[in-house]
Amino acid sequence: LPDKEGGKVLNDPYFWFLLVSLVGLLGFVSIISLNTGLNHDELEHVHSAWYVANGFLPYGDFFQNHNPLIWYICAPLLGFLGETAASILAMRVICLFFMLGSLAVSLLITRRLTSSLPAGIVSLLLLLTSSFFLASAYQIRPDVPQVFFGLWGVYFLLLFIEKSSGARAVLSGMSLALSFLFLQKAVFLIGAAGLVFVFFNFRDRLPFRYLLLFGVSFAAPILAFLAVLFFNGLIEDYYITNYLVNLNRIRTFSPLRTISRFADRDYLFLIFALFSLPVLLLARGSDRKTGSLAFITLLMVFSIRFHDRPHSQNFLPMLPLLAIGLSVFLHRFFERFKTPAPAKILIMLLLIGIPFRNVLPKLHSSNRPRLEAIMHVVENTGPNDPVYDGNIKFNVYRPDLHYFWYSVNRGKLLDSYNRVTGNRFGKYDIYDLIFTRKPKFISLFDIDREDPRFEKLMRMYSSTPYLDIHRLNKEK
């Protein structure tokens, strides 16, 4: 797609400022993605990939409340690299590539709306300096590929609005379906994009085959997934763990708590991005593609109120859309007022420089202590030795004591599961499990220290040099 500016962009100091900033930030993010400390959510998905690699089935053999595609993508790495720290870092690299892919699609969308390469780069800089985006954008979690495929769904939708074709309808529907197969929360983007697709089909009186192609291409991957669940006898378990449990959480919190953190860290980005959306949607002369993007983004913003535990990763799908909207707004603002390069550079320094201060502390974070603890457990256990690690801090390559291996503390997913299953695991007792199976390593997470059995437990286990990892004493 050619730039309106043509060759002039190469003589523009503003363009070179943007390009140098982009290269520097991409290098910075690549470094921190390999070194930043590992989140326990990440280890949850590493452990699930290990289960899958060893022939266990999610939902039936071990508890999970996410869609499964990321584990099946990561599992082959364990065959190549083994139960090593390198496998975990390789999974980080995969998610880094998904993040870079999301940036590339954001660039494509912005250029499609503006015919401007500098505007496309602006959308990337806004994301790469957002501490909220970088809090989870390269982590080992299904949210990351969910965003990648969701953005492709939006891109092909905008192409369809520009010029309808069956191929564009199919690619949009299939991309949105793949986004869902990584994470159920994609339903919010799917709903928003689906509304726009249906609206333009009826408004422009397009042939019914486009709706059919979009619907079939969206439904086919999901039906294939459901067929796999059915033939493995997992439909009921999947419905319970991924829907009933998630919809009946006991511990919830208001979106305002997370939004206030977002506003505190990235307030300039948030304020100007939210201001730009109604302008792009309602301004005279706003084209259909830009209005559609603004509408989808506004619906994504409003969808946050339907999240019962909106952590920073729940904002990931909307952040690229907000960045694209703001970059389109800035591009039109600069064009309308014929803003000189020094003024544009100053505005961008404010927009990306202030929030970047909150990203710099990531340079001092290290994943080495966590990886050393993980490998200590691996090196001192056999392949079939169970481990208790209820908070997912060190056990990623060994079996657990129970079907429910995380979120076992009061008010969390185990209690939600028991609520919707007639107390199926109501007799869950971590003391009984430990005394019966005698795992070589345990955590004291969610172990009642007031329980009279705690003293016996402490006679059985001794502390290690690693935080909250206790090793079974040798029998005398």
List each language-model region with its residue ranges:
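Extracytoplasmic
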Residues: 185-186, 232, 350-476
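Hydrophobic, aromatic-rich transmembrane alpha-helices
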Residues: 104, 266-301
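Membrane-interface alpha helices of multi-pass inner-membrane proteins
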Residues: 123-124, 168-184, 190-196, 220, ...
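Transmembrane-helix signature of polytopic, membrane-embedded enzymes
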Residues: 14-16, 106-129, 147-148, 166, ...
